């Protein structure tokens, strides 16, 4: 399943045979939502124009696309869009806490654009280091990708694909420095149990990232009481 976010609205690409249980449940929930609109691709040209049409149809919150080839449909949807690749990190420390940043009055995670000749893991590490002023980072694994759209400075519809990695930080948590040039106002370390209150003030794409991360990272799993 792929979600393309248009602010808090989204286009969802799915198939009838989602491999992940979470995706199956998400699709079922969306299909039962009366505000969901369905689109069945049959014409490549119409599919290419769909993102531009969706930006105008602001009364539609969710547009579901059923397809047998999700990647091909994603490529078709993005064919006429400006494409940007970015890398970012969900950072945890030795105390099992998560790093969040406050940017433009919304809680977010550090991320940024891939530079020429740079592999995506290097991008993700560099951006976390620059935006948070921390080093001693180690990538543990890739979590997922998220897709969101925006209008660039030339008023062209742009899609940013962000590759998210779980990173472990082995330094002192007091050593963070928000990058003011990127409008980062605050950096906090929080316990996983505190996360829901922060997700009340964040982007839908970040909520999706954490939904995936909770199925992968041990810090989100219930701790067994020790005798």
Question: Predicted segments — roles?
Answer:
Residues 88, 97, 186:
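Conserved beta-strand and immediately adjacent loop positions that scaffold enzyme active sites
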Residues 27-31, 40, 92-129, 134:
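Conserved Nudix-box catalytic region and its N-terminal flanking loop in Nudix hydrolases
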Residues 91-94, 167-169:
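Active-site beta-strand termini and strand-to-loop segments that position acidic
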Residues 1, 86, 160-164:
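Short hydrophobic/aromatic beta-strand or adjacent loop that forms the aromatic wall/cage
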Residues 2-6, 16-18, 22, 27-31, ...:
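Nudix hydrolase/Nudix homology domain
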Residues 43-88:
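Acidic, metal-coordinating catalytic segment for phosphate/diphosphate chemistry
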Residues 114-203:
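Unchanged
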Residues 1-55:
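N-terminal leader/capping segments at the start of a protein or of a new domain
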């Amino acid at each position: 399943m792929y979600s393309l976010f248009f602010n808090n609205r989204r286009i969802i690409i799915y198939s009838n045979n989602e491999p992940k249980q979470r995706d199956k449940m998400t699709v079922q929930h969306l299909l039962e939502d009366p505000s969901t609109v369905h689109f069945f691709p049959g014409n490549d040209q119409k599919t290419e124009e769909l993102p531009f049409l969706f930006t105008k149809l602001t009364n539609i919150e969710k547009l579901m696309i059923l397809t047998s080839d999700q990647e091909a449909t994603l490529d078709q949807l993005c064919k006429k869009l400006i494409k940007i690749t970015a890398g970012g990190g969900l950072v945890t420390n030795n105390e099992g806490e998560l790093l969040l940043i406050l940017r433009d009055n919304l809680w977010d995670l550090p991320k940024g654009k891939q530079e020429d000749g740079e592999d995506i893991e290097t991008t993700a590490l560099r951006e976390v280091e620059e935006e948070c002023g921390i080093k001693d980072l180690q990538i543990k694994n890739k979590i997922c990708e998220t897709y969101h759209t925006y209008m660039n400075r030339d008023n062209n519809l742009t899609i940013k694909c962000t590759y998210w990695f779980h990173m472990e930080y082995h330094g002192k948590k007091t050593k963070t420095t928000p990058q003011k040039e990127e409008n980062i106002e605050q950096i906090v370390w929080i316990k996983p149990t505190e996360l829901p209150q922060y997700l009340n003030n964040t982007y839908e794409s970040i909520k999706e990232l954490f939904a995936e991360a909770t199925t992968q990272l041990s810090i989100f799993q219930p701790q067994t009481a020790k005798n």
